[in-house]
Each structure stands twice: as structure tokens, then as C-alpha cells.
């Protein structure tokens, strides 16, 4: 199934029911007092995260969601029935944004998370509330309040531990195939990956993490070039970025961009889109070593690392041949283990 990761919807809560003007009409009580009941509250609109849903594709066909109106009050002090709530089901990892204010009003990261996005209107008051010493038979009631209405933007952000970052055709899809059971399309042309792919990497029994292969980025991605910013958001939840670089064409690089300049270009795009992305741990993966002699590949890798002044971990691999891929995954697992230990230690200290 193709991932649809953005949608815009209009939600409208139900109006409250109107209050009733009514009077007691009983035998032997000719001048019965007011007994008009209150209107019922309008239904509200809720968004609920469900782990069994994995795309926003249904919102292409249905974009307007309304909750039920509250029923009007009735005589004999009978309250109107409240309107039914409207439940909208979305994938886990959905961010809800108010389009008018651009405010994030909710981030649904766990199965069963619920978010109230439009509150139903209160029911109107019946005339039984307006009886007084000077007005024994009031004909006054109030109408129900209008329900809230909001235009919302839904953004699905993948819940992955590791994000693969790189130019188109850097070998991200090949790497995720090599280390997980995911089977993204792989071919020797840019933008083979048009939708994000998720793979589960198992290092040992009961020890695994999720890795995301997002479509390749190009210069100007922060402005929407190539496949634009729609996939950069998927990197925001990751705990570690693996920056893949096609290091084989040292004589001019990919489309005339050297391997070191590929890294610098994408760093600029990350900073323009979200400076926090550059603060995430990021490891360099120099791919396609199989296209060079072993000594030549090692020397080329060291040249790139020196040119960048790279101080974080780096690896020389052939994703196609799976050479050097397992040590990366083993190191990633160890990195997450250390992270968990540090977090536990910090909680205990607090």
C-alpha cells in the first residue's frame, strides 16, 4: 500500500439542542408552572490513533466530519438527548495541526491516544429555569450553542529509530533490503523510492530496532525541490541518522557533486528545514565500495572523512554485497542500549 502521509479535513462538532418552553398540564392543576427541559449537548469530534491503520489514504475520499446535533428539550422537564460523538481513526504517529493558526494541537504517538478536536455546543436552557416571584409563567428559553468547527491538517510522521539520509541513488533502499525484511523497489535511477519504507532490523533474539528509508533528497529540498519537504518530517522522530553517500565516483561525483559536497549540501537542507535535525546523532556511511579496489576504496573514504573534518562514527560498506553492513547495525543496537541506560540513570537520579 502506498503511504499517504498528509491530509486536510474539516471537523464540525454538533450544535446544542434548544431549550423548551412548556407548562404543566395536569387535571385539577389549571395554572401549572413551567416545565420546559434543557436541550442536549452537541456531539464532539475526536481523533483516535490506531496501530492497525497505517496510512491517511481514506481522507482523500472523505474530508468533512460532523458530529450529531443535540436534541431539543421537552416538556415535563425532560432533557434532550445528547448528540453522538464523531470518532476519526488515524495511524499512530499522526500530528494534528490547526490550519488557521498553524498550531500543533496534538501528537498521537501511542495506540489508543485520543484528541478532542472540536467540542460540542452546550444545550439551551428550558423555561423552567426562568421562573421567578414576578414571572410565574416565563415563556423564555435559550437556544443551544454552536459546536466548534476547525480546519485541520493531519501529518503522518513515521515512528522509526533510525532514518536513512542521502542523495537519490545513494543506496538507501539497497541497504534497508540488506539489513531487514523490507523490500523497497531498487533500480539504478534517482527517485526509485517514492514513499517511505520501514524495516525491522533484528541484531539478536528479542533485540531489534526500526529503520526508515525515505526518498532521496536533493539541493533545494527544504523549498520543495525533488520530492520536497513532505518526507523530511519523517526524520524528526528518529533517534539516529545514517547519512549514506555514493563514494565510488570520486572523479566528479554524482551529477558533478563530489561525495564531500553531497554531505555538505544535505546538511544545509536539514538546517534550513529544521535545525534540530542537525543536532541528532548522525553517522556517515560511505557506500558502493564494491565498485573500487579495496585499498583504493579505503584511501578514498579516508580522504572524504578528512575533507569533511568528520568526527562522528563512519563506515565503508557495499550495501549490494552486504559487506560491512552488519557491524553498523550492531553498533546502532549498542548505541540505543547506551541511550536507554543513560535515560534510566537520569530518571533514577531525578
From Swiss-Prot:
Q: Spell out the Gene3D superfamilies in the cross-references.
A: GTP1/OBG domain, P-loop containing nucleotide triphosphate hydrolases
What EC number(s) does its UniProt record assign? 3.6.5.-
EC class of this enzyme?
A: hydrolase
Localization of this protein: Cytoplasm
The residues that hold GTP are 166-173, 191-195, 213-216, 287-290, 318-320
Q: Which InterPro entries match?
A: G_OBG, GTP-bd, GTP-bd_Obg/CgtA, GTP1-OBG_CS, GTP1_OBG_dom, GTP1_OBG_dom_sf, OBG_GTPase, P-loop_NTPase
Recorded superkingdom:
Bacteria
For this record, the Gene Ontology CC terms, alphabetical, are:
cytoplasm
- Molecular function terms from GO: GTP binding; GTPase activity; magnesium ion binding
Record key words, sorted: Cytoplasm, GTP-binding, Hydrolase, Magnesium, Metal-binding, Nucleotide-binding
Could you tell me the Gene Ontology terms of the biological process aspect for this record?
ribosome biogenesis
**Residues binding Mg(2+):** 173, 193
Q: Which cofactor does it need?
A: Mg(2+)
| Pfam families in the record | GTP1_OBG (PF01018), MMR_HSR1 (PF01926)
Give the Obg domain ranges: 1-159
Polar residues compositional bias, start-end: 130-143
Domain OBG-type G: from-to ranges: 160-337
Its principal location?
cytoplasm
Tell me the subunit arrangement.
Monomer.
Q: What's the stated role of this polypeptide?
A: An essential GTPase which binds GTP, GDP and possibly (p)ppGpp with moderate affinity, with high nucleotide exchange rates and a fairly low GTP hydrolysis rate. Plays a role in control of the cell cycle, stress response, ribosome biogenesis and in those bacteria that undergo differentiation, in morphogenesis control.
Which family, according to UniProt?
Answer: Belongs to the TRAFAC class OBG-HflX-like GTPase superfamily. OBG GTPase family.
Can you name this protein? GTPase Obg
The organism is Xanthomonas oryzae pv. oryzae (strain KACC10331 / KXO85)
In the record, what lineage is assigned to the organism producing the protein?
Bacteria, Pseudomonadati, Pseudomonadota, Gammaproteobacteria, Lysobacterales
Gene name, per UniProt, is: obg
Amino acid at each position: 500500500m502506498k503511504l499517504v502521509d498528509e491530509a486536510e479535513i474539516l471537523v464540525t462538532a454538533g450544535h446544542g439542542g434548544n431549550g423548551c418552553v412548556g407548562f404543566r398540564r395536569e387535571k385539577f392543576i389549571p395554572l401549572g408552572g413551567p416545565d420546559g427541559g434543557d436541550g442536549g449537548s452537541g456531539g464532539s469530534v475526536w481523533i483516535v490513533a490506531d496501530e492497525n491503520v497505517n496510512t491517511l489514504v481514506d481522507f482523500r475520499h472523505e474530508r468533512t466530519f460532523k458530529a450529531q446535533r443535540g436534541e431539543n428539550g421537552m416538556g415535563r422537564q425532560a432533557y434532550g438527548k445528547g448528540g453522538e460523538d464523531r470518532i476519526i481513526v488515524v495511524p499512530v504517529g499522526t500530528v494534528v495541526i490547526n490550519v488557521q493558526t498553524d498550531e500543533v494541537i496534538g501528537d498521537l504517538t501511542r495506540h489508543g491516544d485520543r484528541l478532542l478536536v472540536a467540542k460540542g455546543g452546550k444545550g439551551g436552557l428550558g423555561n423552567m429555569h426562568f421562573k421567578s416571584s414576578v414571572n410565574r409563567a416565563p415563556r423564555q428559553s435559550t437556544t443551544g450553542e454552536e459546536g466548534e468547527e476547525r480546519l485541520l491538517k493531519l501529518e503522518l510522521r513515521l515512528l522509526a529509530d533510525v532514518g536513512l539520509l542521502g542523495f537519490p541513488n545513494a543506496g538507501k533502499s539497497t541497504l534497508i533490503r540488506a539489513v531487514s525484511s523490507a523490500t523497497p523497489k531498487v533500480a539504478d535511477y534517482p527517485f526509485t523510492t517514492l514513499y517511505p519504507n520501514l524495516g525491522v532490523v533484528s541484531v539478536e533474539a528479542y533485540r531489534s530496532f526500526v529503520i526508515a528509508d525515505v526518498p532521496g533528497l536533493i539541493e533545494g529540498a527544504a523549498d520543495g525541490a525533488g520530492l520536497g519537504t513532505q518526507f523530511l518530517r519523517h526524520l524528526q522522530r528518529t533517534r539516529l541518522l545514517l547519512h549514506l553517500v555514493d563514494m565510488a565516483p570520486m572523479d566528479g561525483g554524482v551529477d558533478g557533486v563530489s561525495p564531500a559536497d553531497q554531505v555538505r549540501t544535505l546538511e544545509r537542507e536539514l538546517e534550513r528545514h529544521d535545525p534540530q535535525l542537525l543536532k541528532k546523532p548522525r553517522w556517515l556511511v560511505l557506500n558502493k565500495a564494491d565498485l573500487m579496489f579495496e585499498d583504493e576504496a579505503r584511501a578514498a573514504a579516508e580522504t572524504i572523512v578528512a575533507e569533511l573534518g568528520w568526527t562522528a562514527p563512519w563506515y565503508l560498506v557495499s550495501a549490494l554485497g552486504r559487506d560491512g553492513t552488519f557491524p553498523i547495525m550492531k553498533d546502532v543496537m549498542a548505541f540505543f542500549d547506551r541511550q536507554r541506560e543513560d535515560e534510566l540513570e537520569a530518571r533514577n537520579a531525578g
